[in-house]
Amino acid sequence: MVYSSSSMSNTNIRRRSVPITIQKSRMDGFAEANQLLSSALEQLDDIIRNGNSTSRSTTTIGSAGPTPIIKKSFRDLLPPPPALRSTFSPRIMENGHSNLAHKQHINDDIDNGNADDERSSREINRQWISTDWKHRTDLGSDGSSGVESPPSDLPTSSSSLFSPPRVYQEFVKAIDEQTMTERPDLETRLKIMQWVAGRTSPSPSMSTVSCPEYPELQDKLHRLAMARDSLQLQVSVLSEQVGAQKEKIKDLETVIALKRNNLTSTEELLQDKYHRIDECQELESKKMDLLAEVSSLKLRYATLEREKNETEKKLRLSQNEMDHVNQSMHGMVVQQQLAHHTNGHSSGGYMSPLREHRSEKNDDEMSQLRTAVQRLMADNEHKSLQINTLRNALDEQMRSRSQQEDFYASQRNYTDNFDVNAQIRRILMDEPSDSMSHSTSFPVSLSSTTSNGKGPRSTVQSSSSYNSSLSAVSPQHNWSSAGAGTPRQLHPIGGNQRVNNITSAQYCSPSPPAARQLAAELDELRRNGNEGANHNYSSASLPRGVGKASSTLTLPSKKLSVASGTSVGELGGSMSSVAQPTPKRNYRAQMNRWINEKLRRKRAVSAPNLVESDDEIARGRNLNNATSQSNLKNFSRERTRSSLRNIFSKLTRSTSQDQSNSFRRGSAARSTSTARLGSTNHLGTVSKRPPLSQFVDWRSEQLADWIAEIGYPQYMNEVSRHVRSGRHFLNMSMNEYEGVLNIKNPVHRKRVAILLRRIEEDIMEPANKWDVHQTLRWLDDIGLPQYKDVFAENVVDGPLLLSLTANDAVEMKVVNAHHYATLARSIQFLKKADFRFNAMEKLIDQNIVEKYPCPDVVVRWTHSATCEWLRKIDLAEFTQNLLFAGVPGALMIYEPSFTAESLAEILQMPPHKTLLRRHLTSHFNQLLGPKIIADKRDFLAAGNYPQISPTGRVKVVKKGFSLTRKKAKNEICLEPEELLCPQVLVHKYPTGAGDNSSFESSNV
């Protein structure tokens, strides 16, 4: 048979495309193999279709040749052409049934899907060899076969018989070269079976005559159809499963969307939390700033308190000065009045010119006195403004005073009632209209002119002892009585000496109304003097009266100099020999009643002595005790007084003369600290560290004031009752403090002993200036404000800080090992910094991370600076755990058992957060430097002390024969007398960091 040209061209085109498809199958696996098989099957369909059409058009049928089948797994399923059956029959007969049996075995393998590729390829190679092709070609060309072949559906032609199809050759070659060793998948097999069932349906003659295996093939096809149906069912089931999986995927996508929404909301919550944390940190920083401001306000309050005390002292001194001025003015007026009387009552012709001269001189003096009074009023108004300003400042301080003032109020109430200065102020404030009515005098320091303008100038000094004025104006004195003893005379300084060159601004009267009243009273005295000068007097009682008056008005020449001109000097010189008239009784009685009424209403008997002492304080005199006592004794012997007055004077002098050496500005004792009045000292008026020479002579009242001044007013009664003097106090022991003075607190006993020892040894250290207010602020700086109450109760100051022991710390409830170490290292830092209050830094450098290591800077950090550093290294969420923890820079530098692990435990970092702990350790080691870290590591390796932890406890080892309890794991045993900061630092503390050079180089 001959193929048509169109079919041949299509065949050639398809043959040329086969190698390309095979190459693709080599690269892409089963997918490309499926495409290859599909294209091969289509080519075979075209060949068969074209062959059938050609066989119908031709009339001659050559010998049938083999039709190539391109799939190895279905080659044996196709029956050979009729032309080849006769060729195979002799071979089959020669080999018996071996070939058929073998073929049957292969078919069974195909049915079961177990055919081996290599066995199939060997079978193909064994059956379809080139010799068989040649033999079949020869048989077909001879045409001498006597057996007639049945008609075949396959195309037969000379070209196809002599040359097998190229597709077949390439496919066989691929199988021989084992390039298609993979088994075809199920889909490929189904396609092959469909092609076999659809394209190889034999004719009836072929099924009955030429193909005895046709029933078996039909069974196989039926089984394959059933397998196809089952596979389709499986595919449908799988598609349903895929649909279910898709629904599950959709559900999962919905869940994922919900999770994403939850994650978004969680992130928003976290952002809000971070914002809240930032706000909390800001509030914490503001809180720390407020605490610092409160501490500064407390310090300012303490400063204002001291200033208030000083202002009160100045105010009292001013009141005393004014009172002394009034007394001096009163004495001068009395002397002037007596001079008027003597001038007016003198007899003889020579007294008339003297009286006229005296009258003219009095007019001049009164004009000058008025001028001085005007200046005094102006100065007094200025002084009143200053006093009002001071009082307003005191009122403001009193309104802002805290509860401490209430605590000391009871100690001051009973003393204020007996304060002479307070009584004077009350009199001046309650009765301003007549507050100066008792003194119709002018200040001692008033200027006057000399006689005829030629006399020398002299100065009248204020008296340091005013007993003479007291006797002169005492209500018990009688001008007409005759005194025993020799009358004393006035001591003139010289002839023509006058009072001169004195300013009136040295002393001021209590209030402007009183100063204005002074001029009116002077005018009244002048009128009384002029009226008295016109009366006639008898000369019988003149020597006696004048003698008594002179004896009562005479002041010591060392203290007061009085001169009234030439006439006064002549009068003083001839007082004992010249007979002088005596004033009338009505004038004497009138003057005496006026003076007695004023003094009875305004003054006490012992007041002048007190005023004298206050005046000595104001002038700052350093009086000699022996000299003052001798002067007073001499003065007392020359005077004649009544017995009652002598008793009062002895009482007042006995209490004041013993302490005359201490009555000066800045001394520990005050003039009003007498046995009669009790302790009238306010807090701040007694020095905490007086000189030893003064302290040994202190009495019980002064020592009681001192014990209150150092902060223990609860022991005032015991001290005033049992301690006789300062020397006795210095010689007392600790047991006497507890048994006699009832000081049960051991910290109080230690502080009293420390202060007494420093007074005795005159120890001057930088710690002396460190008070309890600075200690309380220092506790805020180191992060331990919870101990402020107990430190304030024990009045812990600088000297006591240096002397605190482990037993004292336990007594003050400091039992946490971490807090104990914080106090110890902070005290060590204060000692190195010479107790400079501003040595610690509350703020850190913003570029601190770039300046690692810097131990000299870290040692000055406060607790708040450490928190700021933690925020700087991104650990802000843990800083709130440092509240009341106490982690200053001194603890990190000086404490060898404080490591990064200790800080992590204080920050409460979870142990499983190793990255955070490693981050903290890295920054901690870089901050302190390798040397300090190496010292800490070596110290802990020795095993003498455990690493600090927030759960550690301090235990004081008690010496005795009792059974010792086993030490717990977190306990640190210390000796009772071990100092928190020893005098000499031993190997327990690292060296080389935070020395004094670092403080000198700092700007604090």
Swiss-Prot record:
Residues 280-328, 364-396 form a coiled coil. Residues 50-122, 135-161, 341-366, 432-497, 528-550, 648-686 are annotated as: Disordered. GO terms for biological process: neuromuscular junction development; positive regulation of locomotion; regulation of nematode pharyngeal pumping; reproductive process. One of its GO terms (cellular component) is presynaptic active zone. Pfam families: SAM_1 (PF00536), SAM_2 (PF07647). Residues 698-762, 770-833, 858-930 form the SAM domain. Residues 434-453, 531-541, 648-684 have a biased composition (Polar residues). The keyword Nucleus does not apply. InterPro entries: Liprin, Liprin-beta_SAM_rpt_1, Liprin-beta_SAM_rpt_2, Liprin-beta_SAM_rpt_3, SAM, SAM/pointed_sf. The keyword Coiled coil applies. Disruption phenotype: Defective locomotion, reduced pumping rate and reduced brood size. Defects in presynaptic and postsynaptic structures and functions in muscle cells. Resistant to the acetylcholinesterase inhibitor aldicarb and to levamisole, an agonist for postsynaptic acetylcholine receptors in muscles. Double knockout with the syd-2 mutant ju37 increases resistance to aldicarb and levamisole. PANTHER family: AT31531P, LAR INTERACTING PROTEIN LIP -RELATED PROTEIN. Belongs to the liprin family. Liprin-beta subfamily. Involved in the regulation of synaptic function at neuromuscular junctions. Together with the liprin-alpha protein syd-2, may play a role in regulating the structure of the neuronal region, called the active zone, from which synaptic vesicles send neurotransmitter signals across the synapse. Does not seem to be required for neuronal development. May regulate the disassembly of focal adhesions. Does not bind receptor-like tyrosine phosphatases type 2A. This is Liprin-beta homolog. It comes from Caenorhabditis elegans. The gene is hlb-1.
